[in-house]
């Protein structure tokens, strides 16, 4: 699972995913990419599931770049606990994805293979996505 080696704060404030992305809007590494059409918190399990779906379909051909990383911990209180008494324990790690963020990039495979691999990854993510090519973002 993806998680940071160390963080400055154990329980940060929630970061908003509303609005459009400021960076990571273009394809920088690969030939094809997966761009988000919504904003959301994407946790480390969803990112890993999408990566595995892509690499299994491509059968170790090509290269995959993950442009998002889960830096922020999300806390949650246990079930049936009364309100108050502080913030809950860190439950999972999330990446903040805004509208227009390129989340994954692929190179070294044909366009139809890349399109299908990224389609499989789309089903693992909680945001609407679209397939983009280099230079057509």
Curated annotation (Swiss-Prot):
Keyword Kinase: no
Entry-linked InterPro entries: Ribosomal_uL16 (IPR047873), Ribosomal_uL16_bact-type (IPR000114), Ribosomal_uL16_CS (IPR020798), Ribosomal_uL16_dom (IPR016180), Ribosomal_uL16_sf (IPR036920)
Annotated Pfam families: Ribosomal_L16
Top-rank lineage group of the source organism: Bacteria
Any single GO BP term: translation
SUPFAM superfamilies: Ribosomal protein L16p/L10e
GO cellular component terms, semicolon-separated: cytosolic large ribosomal subunit
Job description of the protein: Binds 23S rRNA and is also seen to make contacts with the A and possibly P site tRNAs.
Family: Belongs to the universal ribosomal protein uL16 family.
Protein name, per record: Large ribosomal subunit protein uL16
